[in-house]
Amino acid sequence: MFQYAQSLVQALSSIDGRDVEVIVAYGDEAWRSELDASPLKAVPLQHWKRGETLAKLFMALPGSVARVVARWVNPLVRELATLQCDLWIFPAQDALTWQMREPAIATIHDLMHRYERSFPEAGSWLRFQLRESRFRHLANQSAAVLVDSETGRRHVMESYGTPDDHIYPLPYIAPNYLTDSVETSAFAERYRLPEKFYFYPAQFWPHKNHLRLVQALAAARTTHPDMELVLAGSTKLEYAAVKATANELGLSQAVHFVGYVPDSDLAGFYRHARGLVMPTFFGPTNIPPLEAMVCGCPVLISDKYGMREQCGDAALYFSPQSVEEIHGAMSRLWEDEDLRSSLIKKGLERASLWKQEDFDHRLREILGRVLDRVA
């Protein structure tokens, strides 16, 4: 979500001064340095924490009631009202979106609590109820909804009956820091990567499917004993279970756990990897395939939801349920140089079709339509 918000801020910078004034209001201090480098007017919010807490509590109320109550009770709503904006954009699925006095554009990144309810991080009883309340309000109480893809648009329409003309696909783009980063000798010394490897950057949530990936690696190594895998992500969630499985399968030297990787180092992994392998169950789309393509790294990915919409013919696809299909794709790319060259070329071409300037242009179109409707 942070990367999507970064893309929005950059896009709004290209709009500011063109018959509109853009103000960025923020509560998280992580945004301070980001906005210091932006030409946009940035306003730190004094009541962010309390206001966010109240907004979440008001999720239990009907949307119209929550809006009335928030005007009187929530100091953050009153603080934002003093900025006298005609339209707000909330990029992080915020509960505050439908509680504002002014029209607001919501963002819905995914509805996996509905489509992949077997995973506790999205579909446990409590998590489902909280997400369902939030997203139903976002879909039906906002002036418009941003989604990542046509698949995301369809999910919102199927789930909540939101009118088609209120939902606007605004796909993710790869972060600029990937193409701007310069690799130094310190990178090689810090990570000591194998000469040839697959890469998967993901926190160890069950839906990220690390366990099947490790099992697929074990199967692939029966014919490709030099195949190795590098996993990036903090040592939480299913990390211990994944590491234990790797050890049980005799892969302690073939699976490399590098922990959290800062943004400044991420491009180095993509550039050195044989390919990105991403067996996730969640979508509709994801940012890592975009990162890989822009860095010239082939993509192997789950054939789920909007993945084909995002990657087209620039990826190899497999069922995330099937260890056999995952290791089949990994084995196919491991030795086939022509295939790898073809995927790199197609990935770079696909990445060139949707860049920051395209994102900027699409956002201007969306804002024009929404402002015309709410004026």
Q: Which residue ranges define each predicted feature?
A:
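Carbohydrate transferase catalytic cores enriched for Leloir-type hexosyltransferases
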Residues: 1-375
